[in-house]
Amino acid sequence: MQDRVERVTRYIDNVMANTEGTRAEGVYVVSVALKGRAGQQKLEVLVDSDKGIAVEQCAWVSRRILEKLEEDDEPLSEEIAIEVSSPGLGTPLQLPRQYYRHLGKLLHVRYRTPEGAEAEIEGYLQEAQLDGVNGGDSADSVIVLKPKVQGKRPRNAQPLENIRLPLSRIIKAVPEAEL
């Protein structure tokens, strides 16, 4: 099955390398997963862009992947359902680049403190300083969160300070809906 995932990933990489000037320009792959068992497999491709993604862009990517699969001299042994979609609300961020799209939005972040303990914070993403190749692979990459105020605060309370978190300490960051 791993061989199939690698082959399909190559098709997807080929499709995504040729999006300039198309509906899918600026779209990038977040994750690829082949799910199910033989005869009932589904290829799940999550895509995103720095400005958000439209249904038409997902459809374009899906059609191009299907074309690549059909062009192959060595077709996959069975039919595979293809599902191309964007990461939904509540889906953990998987790539550093995704932080840009969530600037100003509420995130629930689980992270490691400098002492190694796990901690959580809910806050608004104020800044994403992503250094390095592919927007954030460097140890210097950080995000800045403004903590969400829980309940009513006393009138004379000091304002909460922004928190800087290195990406290397983030275990999981999930965009949250604000009600």
From Swiss-Prot:
The keyword Oxidoreductase does not apply. The gene is rimP. It comes from Chlorobium chlorochromatii (strain CaD3). Belongs to the RimP family. GO terms for biological process: ribosomal small subunit assembly; translation. It is found in: Cytoplasm. Coiled coil: none annotated. SUPFAM superfamilies: YhbC-like, N-terminal domain. This is Ribosome maturation factor RimP. Required for maturation of 30S ribosomal subunits. Gene3D superfamilies: RimP-like superfamily, N-terminal. GO terms for cellular component: cytosol. InterPro entries: Ribosome_maturation_RimP, RimP_N, RimP_N_sf. Pfam families: RimP_N (PF02576). It comes from the Bacteria. Keywords: Cytoplasm, Ribosome biogenesis. Its main location: cytoplasm.
